């Protein structure tokens, strides 16, 4: 299970399988013309994770933001 531990302007810290991972990104200002609240940099995910594990983590982050009515961009 993926747990969001901390979200800052420049990174998201998660715990997954008893390990902590930092995923780099950028927090965005929510404005009328901007529906997105965060950009996640896919290439900042740990290379030791399988592609399935990486997608599991990304999906958990997307669901976290979605539960708050916010959207993310994956780059």
Please provide the spans of the model-predicted regions.
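Acidic, low-complexity intrinsically disordered segments
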Residues: 30-75
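N-terminal acidic leader/helix
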Residues: 2-34
């Amino acid at each position: 299970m993926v747990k969001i531990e901390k979200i800052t302007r420049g990174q998201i810290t998660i715990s997954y399988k008893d390990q902590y991972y930092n995923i780099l990104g950028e927090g965005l200002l929510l404005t009328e013309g901007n529906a997105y609240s965060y950009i996640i940099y896919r290439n900042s995910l740990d290379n030791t994770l399988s592609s399935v594990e990486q997608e599991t983590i990304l999906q958990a982050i997307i669901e976290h933001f979605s539960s708050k009515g916010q959207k993310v961009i994956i780059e």
